Amino acid sequence: MAEGRGTHERPDVETQKTELGALMGTTLQRGAQWYLIDSRWFKQWKKYVGFDSWDMYNVGEHNLFPGPIDNSGLFSDPESQTLKEHLIDELDYVLVPTEAWNKLLNWYGCVEGQQPIVRKVVEHGLFVKHCKVEVYLLELKLCENSDPTNVLSCHFSKADTIATIEKEMRKLFNIPAERETRLWNKYMSNTYEQLSKLDNTIQDAGLYQGQVLVIEPQNEDGTWPRQTLQSKSSTAPSRNFTTSSKPSASPYSSMSASLIANGDSTNSSGMHNSGVSRGGAGFSASYNCQEPPSPHIQPGLCGLGNLGNTCFMNSALQCLSNTGPLTEYFLKDEYEAEINRDNPLGMKGEIAEAYAELIKQMWSGRDTHVAPRMFKTQVGRFAPQFSGYQQQDSQELLAFILDGLHEDLNRVKKKPYLEPKDANGRPDAVVAKEAWENHRLRNDSVIVDTFHGLFKSTLVCPECAKVSVTFDPFCYLTLPLPLKKDRIMEVFLVPADPHCRPIQYRVTVPLMGAISDLCEALSKLSGIAAENMVVTDVYNHRFHKIFQMDEGLSHITPRDDIFVYEICTTPMDGSEYITLPVYFREKKSRPSSTSSGAVLYGQPLLVSVPKHRLTLESLYQAVCERISRYIKQPLPEEFLSSPLEPGACNGSRGSYEGDEEEMDHQEEGKEQLSEVEESGEDSQGGDPTETTQKAKGPPRHKRLFTFSLVNSCGTADINSLATDGKLLKLNSRSTLAIDWDSETRSLYFDEQESEACEKHTSMSQPQKKKKAAIALRECIELFTTMETLGEHDPWYCPTCKKHQQATKKFDLWSLPKILVVHLKRFSYNRYWRDKLDTVVEFPVRALNMSEFVCDRAARPYVYDLIAVSNHYGAMGVGHYTAYAKNRLNGKWYYFDDSSVSLASEDQIVTKAAYVLFYQRRDDECPSTSSPVSFPGSDGGAKLSSSQQDLGEEEAYTMDTN
């Protein structure tokens, strides 16, 4: 097999580096095509050409050759080449422009059978345009009006137009080009809106993941099957469209081969007019086909439909919806008089209007659930990071909504310029009052009234002792959690004894530890000396990385498959050994080519062999010994040229490390991978495929496999080892492949045994009990603890006239009516992400924050919990829900997208709690004033006994006991 399968001659590594380097800085342009490449392959290519200045070691070595582009690690299904969910840019894949892709493809080729992963650049944002590559296409459900139960799943780019969808649907449902059609957007089970603007993009139309679209062909008599429904329900004109002058179907649309049964069907009775949504982006008609709603739905108990990974948005919205002062403000239409359409920092009032419309729907008492489609569309226009359908952070969205509502509703029309002032020894009360008044001169809205408090920040210079005190507003408290110090890892230990299966262990290691810590922990459980272990990352049947003992464990992500190999101590005779990576490959004939291909399979091995006086025969015996467990017995006599019994020791850890050191000092340019030297001895080595024999030697026997010297990925051959009459000279950077033909592998290789492993008792034993739950007060104390600024984040001291690593301390000066507490559960580095699942115990009633407020003249700050945003799962994946207290009946409910169920207080405190909403007790609290009359309620609402008793409870101070 040649080194890659590119169609053009490959230039030298310096030229490759220069040409690709210039292209990788290409700016994203709307409509341009970019390609995804598995980051592991791309990193290997960068090492090969010395792309990064800090990684120039062994540039151009054959052993680093990346081979053909291989994206198999990105697919959840190799056959359909469906992308895995939640892939992360730079971590899992890299994006390259078309010209860069074409060069790499010409130089290296692509793994046979793989199609390029090409995606469009789409533009987001209304005022500030933001381009990004649309990695995940939008899945739409398509059906024909006459048969709504047969739904086809089809993928489109958000840059595709409505006309593109219509043309694709004509093709799928065999609708003649001359027959007129109408396209309907079906959502909320039985609500339909007509898509009339053919030039609108999918993004403009606000279509979301899993959206159902219905195509309606015109009847032969010129009428429409839905004409009666439309005439009864819609006052807006509709626009029928034909097929003339339509653009061709998008190359980015692809249809799933499977039919998906959909139980929803059109109900022709009980229609009512739902009106046309504000900013409907081309929806010219809208109507519902559902039964009249029940008059007994409790206002506020309205679920939110998941539009495709939008549970994070639903969770945040449910918490805000159940924030009484804010919801009352919108339901009373107080926002209409305060919309600031001219604020350059605002969104022309459109976020406020979209939010108001959604809140009115949720509190109308008419619907059990609604789809926040138009609100999401508006958010995506102003905040492109939320425009897609990947999982996002509910707290980040919450911060955007609060900031957006504030700017849209800011009562200040012209913000004055105010010079920031330092305390300069003045009393805190004076400086704080000045800071708050200045803040209100520029920021005056219902959000400031409800959510804003004041921090006190103290900086002390370590050199001159200058003290700087400032007061800054905040909208929510982000509280750190005590970081865990340990990490649990699951690894496979591969014993040196070839008869023993790999054993899976669960070990506890320091969170910021080294590979040596992993080996020590594994040694305690296995009894194998840590110095005899080699830790590897196995990926796609090859070694992605072989770790050194001093490397950090942070390089290993939870998704990596870690195999630890036992390497024996130095043999008694003192001979020097080297340890070689060995890959299993199956040789396949390619009808379209005269050269053969090879496919990796199975788990790779580390095999130790003598460094000197190594023959092909002794190498074959060493490998046969190592894989003896995989070989089906009995073997035919023709294969028995050497016994498959374990004999010699399988290697030396000491020489493994020593060889690395030796190779570091070899002179540059010297061949390091495969050399042969003449030997005066009679060697048994030779071409393993030959069956001829020497004149006086024993008859040669058939071999199970042949050897190839390959690159470190196993994807490109460097040399064969057919070296009759010569000794092999290999080194520790050599990589071998043992190549099986398909028939021999099928007959004699035990696939099941090669994949088998045992589980150590550590896998079944309960994990070490985590630290008991921490109290919320511990998080607050951690937040207010003095810290020293890092060397990369210094403070400029006005006295010393230079940057200093000052000490910094936060304190709380004043707290708002609604206190939003963000528990900082997520942490990450460049290699992996982590979530802290620690249970934080927070009071549901009577949270006393007074002791944490440094203004001793302040009012009491006692709060009751009103909502919680929950996150289940790991960072970047998982699911968001919410608990919230309905202010009309005083009961707790659990909101899970469109589902709403009754909950109890003892369910609320869990390890999933992420964002907490507290409402302050005071004379202005809605619980002691006349409640607003909500639509759908009986003119007012009676407070539950629990609410009436709430004001009489004794406030308690948080206690860790």
From Swiss-Prot:
Residues 11-122 form the DUSP domain. Residues 225-243 have a biased composition (Polar residues). It comes from Rattus norvegicus. The gene is Usp4. Its EC number is 3.4.19.12. SUPFAM superfamilies: Cysteine proteinases (SSF54001), DUSP-like (SSF143791). Disulfide bonds: none annotated. The modification Phosphoserine is found at residues 445, 655, 674, 679. GO terms for cellular component: cytoplasm; nucleus. The DUSP and ubiquitin-like 1 domains promote ubiquitin release and thus enhance USB4 catalytic activity. However, these domains do not bind ubiquitin. This is Ubiquitin carboxyl-terminal hydrolase 4. Residues 485-773 are annotated as: Interacts with DUSP and ubiquitin-like 1 domains and is required for USP4 activation.
